C-alpha cells in the first residue's frame, strides 16, 4: 500500500471516529437522552480497529455512560477494566488516571470493603507523579477513602504529600486546600497542637499569598469553619464568637447575587479546579455550625430557628441534585434539634425527629450513614428513654452507644448519662466503677470543656445524693467556674439549681435563693423546662420557709404548670408509634409509622470536590440538663 493510500485510510478512519463520537454526544445530550443509540455509536468505533489510545478512551467513555445513565454496573466495570489494561502502560496518557478514579468509585459502590479501590488509586498515584493535577486529585480521593475507613493517619500522610506536591508546582491555592484538609483529619484525631500549627500556617498563606479575592474568600470560609469547629470541640463557646461572626459575614459575601459562579472562579487554571464544597453546601454548613454553637451556649430558640432554615435549604438543594453530603448534614441537624426538643420538654417531637433521622440513614446506599450514625441514634434514644423514665431501656441504649463508637467525647457523654442512671437506681458499685473509669480516661487527655464541666456536675450530684454537701459544693463551684468562663448557659443553670438545692438541704435559705433566682432566669431564656420544674419546687419551699404565702402560691402554680406539660407530653410519647424505637438494640432500627417530624422542618424548597469528612463528631453540643441531671 502506498504512503498516500495509507494516509487517506487513516484520515478516513479519523473522520469516522469523529463522526461517531459526535453522533454519540448528540444522542447523549438529546432531550430526553437516547442512551441506547449513544452506546451503539461508541460500540461501532471498535469495528474500525482503532489505535490503542482511541480504544482506551472509548472504553472509558462507555464506562462513564453506563455508570451515569444505566444500572449495568458489570458492563461498566468491564469497559473500565479494559480501558485501564490498555492505558496503564502508555506514557503521557491521562485516560489511565480518569479510568482509575472511576474504577475506584465503582469498587466502593459494589465491593464489601475498600481494598480494591485503595489498591487501584495507589497504583494510579504512583504513575501520576509527573502530572500534578491528577496526582493531587488522586491523592485527595485516596485520602477520602482512608478517612471514611477511619484510617486517619494514612489519610493525613497522603494529604501531607499532596501539600508538598502542590508547593513544588507553586500551586498555592491547592496547597492551602491540602493543609486545611489535613487540619480537619488531625482535628478528628484530637491532635490539637498539630491542628493549631496547621491552621496558623494556612491562615498566614491565605492572608498574604492568595491574590485572587474570590479564591481567598472561599479558603477563608474553609479556614473559619475549621477554626469554629476547633473551638466548639473544646467547649469554648465564648472564645469562638468572633470567628463565628466572621464566618457568617464571609458566607454572606459568597452568597451575594453579584458573586461569580464556581466555574468562573475555579475554571481558569487546572491546578485551581478544586473546591472543598460548592457555595450552596457551604451555606448549609455555616448554618450547621451556628446551630451547634447555639446548642452549646444554651439558646434553644436560636438553634431551632437556624435548624429550620438549614433543613429548608437542604430540601431545595435536594430537588436540584440529591448529593450524599446533604443527607449527612440533615442527619446532624436532626440530631441537634432532637436535643433541643428534649431540653424544652417536647419529647414526642423528639422521638418523631429521631425517626426522621433513622429514615435518612436507612435511605443512604449500603447503610453507610447508618453505620456512621448508629451510635448517635442509640445515644439519642437513650436520652429519650431516660426522659420518659425507662431507665432499663436507657441503660441498654447507652451501653450500645459506648460499644459502637470510637469517638471519645460521645463515649464520655454516654458514660456520664449511665452514671446518672446508676445514681437514680441506687447502683452504687456500678456508679463508682463508671466514675473512676471516666476520671482515669479523661484526666490526662484532651476533652471538651463542656463535657468536663458535666463530669464535675455529675460528681456534685453524686455527692448531693450521699448528703456530702461540702463535697457537692466543691464540685459544683468547679463546674460553675468552667461554665461561666465560656458562657455555657445550660451548664450554669443546672449547676446553680443543684447548688441551690444543696444550700436548701443545709438550711441556708438565703444562699439557696441567691442560686435559684439566676438559675430560673437562665432557664426561662433557654428555655429549659426541667430546670424550671426543679427551680419552682425549690422556690415553693423557700417561700414557705419565709412565710411568703403569695409567692409560695405562684411558685406552686408554676410547678404544677411545668409538671402538667411534661405529663401531657409523656402521654403523647407512649402513644406514639415511634416510641417502639426504645426497643432497638442491634441491627437495623425498626420501621415505625406515625406523624412525620414537625412540618415546619420539612418545607419544600466543573470543579473537583476534595470531599474529606466535614463534621467529625455530632456529640459536641451535648450538655447536662434536667431535674435529675439528664444530659442533652
From Swiss-Prot:
SUPFAM superfamilies documented for this protein: TPR-like
One GO process term, biological-process aspect: maintenance of mitotic sister chromatid cohesion
InterPro entries, alphabetized: MAU2 (IPR019440), TPR-like_helical_dom_sf (IPR011990)
Subcellular location, record wording: Nucleus, Nucleoplasm
The organism's place on the tree of life at top rank: Eukaryota
Location (main, coarse): nucleus
Record family assignment: Belongs to the SCC4/mau-2 family.
Protein name, entry field: MAU2 chromatid cohesion factor homolog
Gene3D superfamilies named among the record's database cross-references: Tetratricopeptide repeat domain
Residues passing through the membrane, by range: none
TPR repeat windows: 453-486, 493-526
Task performed by this protein: Required for association of the cohesin complex with chromatin during interphase. Plays a role in sister chromatid cohesion and normal progression through prometaphase.
